Amino acid sequence: MPCRGLHSIPAGPVEFPEIATVYVMCGEKLTVMIDAGVSNSIADFSFLDKLDYIVLTHLHIDHIGLLPELLQVYKAKVLVKSGFKKYLTSEDGLKKLNESAEKVLGDLYYVYGGLEKKLDQDKVIEVEGNEEFDLGGYRMRLIYTPGHARHHMSVLVDDFLFTGDSAGAYFNGVVIPTTPPVIDYKMYMESLKRQIELKPKVVGFAHGGLVSPKIMEEHLKQMLSKEEIQINVDIGGVAGEILRKQIEVNLRGLRESKKSI
């Protein structure tokens, strides 16, 4: 039976699958995946009868890890911000991508896993971040949202906004800045405000799942606060330790970015 509608799939590491979410929108014409999880994931995509595009919100390893596996199964094209295809399709680019991730994430790099092999040139298409696609029953628009990364894009499908890491994360009722080193604080804030102005009905976080758009507004207030942000989320066990380490990375990046303002 053909896939239809929106699907939300946990695609984090086996110790904490819910830390990363991949979204699939199945239209009558096209099926699109938003991000590709971590390489150490056991995410199940077997319900998909086809896959036309994989939109990468950005190239951090927790969003691209399953690309080689997915492209072995499906004849999909990968959409990435213009100027950054080389990091997926060359040995030198792949090395830089993984080394940068290890430097920022520390032990978490080995929990998530890196991108294990480069992709074929013809599998990756560069986009500017303002393209539109008719999925058949749904209209998809790419939106350039730099700040978290220079190559960050969000995806608007009708009234559903998929923000990647450009508008925060959300676990156990707590909003978490998605601000690891090296972010551009000013651009991050501009992208966050611009997405709030879109007035989506539902927001899909890459870390935290589907949430109310009010969470983005809460995150904006959090980021504008004069006080240093403190995050306390205790979910226990190995998953709790992974989340704690990721929060530490994000808050470190936020502190460093504010020094340059």
From Swiss-Prot:
Zinc listed as a keyword: yes
Superkingdom per UniProt: Archaea
Binding residue positions for Zn(2+) 1: H58, H60, H148, D165
One MF term in the entry's GO annotations: zinc ion binding
Keywords, ordered alphabetically: Metal-binding, Zinc
Pfam families reported for this sequence: Lactamase_B
Residues the record lists as binding Zn(2+) 2: D62, H63, D165, H207
UniProt family annotation: Belongs to the metallo-beta-lactamase superfamily.
Subunit structure: Monomer.
Protein's name in the database: Metallo-beta-lactamase fold-containing protein ST1585
